[in-house]
Regions:
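Acidic/His-enriched low-complexity segments
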Residues: 21-220
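Bacterial Sec-dependent N-terminal signal peptides
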Residues: 1-26
């Protein structure tokens, strides 16, 4: 009798474990934040758009400091991008890129509170990003082109971004984590007929000779 009942008891035991795990209060689950090795200080961007290919051509100046320990490398999130150049003080740096994260070798070790600014020239390709979003935001491409070639006359042509929670790195290299804070400024170049909107204050608008306009937004 005991031998025959044993499998049933084991099955009930596992069902009980599964049920308990499924009904656990979500607020009681510990969700560890990402380790903070380098801290973002400031982000400066210059961006323009390829409407046909749904891509962004960008330059980024990213200022960081070691959070606590001395560092000789830095890892930046950058999803599905083409990386053209990475430099510091006009000297090109060695790096490894796996299509998700750029690991950059710094020219020396930096101690806590010693700031350094990386320059990165890149192309963002949001249509090649494969990560998924959430129930509320089903996609996580970070950068969205709406009717980019103006074919659908019932829709306006728009480009907009959505960075929560880790989708900003689909359109510019960064440490894409909610526990990072950065001041920012951005130069956005668009055809003259478009309006731009960004965080911060619109400091200037410059008309270019090719029929585009560069808007400078400052949030520092």
């Amino acid at each position: 009798m005991t031998i025959r009942r044993l499998p049933i008891l084991i099955i009930v035991f596992f069902i009980s474990i599964i049920t308990t795990a499924q009904t656990k209060d979500p607020l009681s689950i510990y969700r560890k934040e990402r380790d903070k090795i380098n801290a973002l200080e400031h982000t400066k961007l210059k961006v323009s758009f390829d409407f046909k290919n749904k891509e962004l051509d960008g330059e980024a100046w990213i200022t960081l400091k070691p959070h606590f320990y001395e560092v000789s490398k830095v890892a930046l999130d950058a999803k599905a991008m083409l990386i053209h150049q990475i430099s510091l003080n006009n000297n090109n740096l060695q790096y490894h890129y796996d299509n998700k994260v750029i690991t950059i070798d710094l020219p020396k070790s930096y101690k806590k509170d010693a700031a350094y600014t990386l320059y990165i020239k890149y192309t963002a390709r949001p249509e090649k990003v494969v990560q998924t979003g959430s129930a509320a935001i089903t996609e996580a491409k970070g950068l969205y082109f709406i009717n980019s070639e103006g074919i659908d006359t019932s829709k306006p042509t728009q480009i907009w971004t959505q960075g929560e929670t880790e989708a900003s790195s689909c359109w510019f290299p960064t440490i894409d984590s909610p526990n990072q804070k950065t001041s920012q400024e951005i130069y956005i170049t668009v055809p003259n007929r478009f309006k731009t909107l960004s965080n911060g204050k619109l400091e200037s608008q410059t008309n270019n000779s090719d029929g585009t306009r560069t808007d400078y937004w400052n949030f520092t």
